[in-house]
Design a protein with these regions (language model features):
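N-terminal glycine-rich anion-binding loops that anchor highly charged ligand groups
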Residues: 27-33
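Short proline/glycine- and basic residue-enriched helix-capping loop/turn segments at helix->loop/beta transitions
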Residues: 81
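Glycine-rich hexapeptide-repeat left-handed beta-helix
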Residues: 1-14, 19, 41, 47-64, ...
Length: 144
């Protein structure tokens, strides 16, 4: 069974039909919609600020979602796919976006609706990826 842990008076909340892998860790101020899947060795750390996840989201193995104390939150829209070993730190991912395996998305970045972040990408703080953009075609740093 996944580790579900209350922190600072916040207990994670989940919608209907969510799959939580046995060794996933969901901590603190995390709210997730229905029909989501959180895969093996994934960590959702809502210990210092909030994480909000829409409906139909899948976050694959080994990913880490965390925020910056009192400065950034994570908002993930509906029907988003987050690949294996992704780090999202205090960013916003809009509906229907895809974050490729091994990518890192930093504080206050915004990935637009339907946008694709290629595997291995680094999306720097405050970067805005427009809706339906594919950034980049090959992995490299995306600069604001």
């Amino acid at each position: 069974m996944a580790l579900i842990k209350s922190v600072r008076g916040f207990t994670p909340e989940f919608g209907e039909n969510c799959f939580l892998a046995d060794n996933a860790a969901i901590i603190g101020d995390v709210k997730m919609g229905r029909d989501c899947s959180i895969w093996f060795s994934t960590v959702l750390r809502g210990d210092v600020n909030s994480i909000r996840i829409g409906n139909g989201v899948n976050i694959q193995d080994g990913s880490v979602l965390h925020t910056l104390y009192e400065k950034s939150t994570i908002e993930i829209g509906d029907h988003v796919s987050v690949g294996h070993n992704v780090t999202i730190h205090g960013a916003t991912i809009k509906d229907y976006a895809l974050v490729g395996m091994g990518s890192t998305i930093l504080d206050h970045a915004i990935v637009g609706e339907g946008a694709i972040v290629a595997a291995g990408s680094l999306v720097l703080s405050n970067t805005v990826i427009e809706p339906t953009d594919r950034k980049p075609d090959r992995p490299h740093a995306i600069r604001p």
